[in-house]
Design a protein with these regions (language model features):
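Conserved mixed alpha/beta catalytic, RNA-binding, or beta-rich assembly cores of soluble enzyme
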Residues: 1-61, 65, 84-85, 94-98
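C-terminal structural segments of small proteins and small subunits
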Residues: 73-97
């Protein structure tokens, strides 16, 4: 799993993606698209395990997760419910914002 934390004046943006998805363009029949090739730098900070991603998910202003593994960590940590998950084709995708 890739994890990148973008530090901003408003808090941390946590971006994480399943490693095998980087470099791919995921699109559904309605034209919804995530370009993990063009925007790879948004996600590719360092390779981490479940524990390090879970720790990063405890301190954020927003979260952007793409892939089965990273989304499963958010579910396990209680940040989201299975019903909150959106899919682009068969790839789970989640955005969380703290207001």
């Amino acid at each position: 799993m890739y994890l990148k934390i973008h530090e901003t004046k408003d808090g941390n943006i946590v971006a994480a993606c399943d490693k095998e998805l980087i470099g791919k363009v995921i699109e559904d029949k309605n034209g919804v698209c995530i370009d993990l090739d063009k925007y790879r730098n948004f996600y590719t900070g360092k390779i981490v395990g479940e524990e390090e991603l879970a720790k990063a998910l405890r301190n954020f202003s927003s979260v952007n997760l793409v892939g089965k593994k990273v989304v499963a960590v958010a579910v396990k940590e209680g940040l989201i419910d299975e019903n909150d998950i959106r899919y682009i084709n068969t790839i789970p995708y989640i955005q969380i914002y703290q207001i």
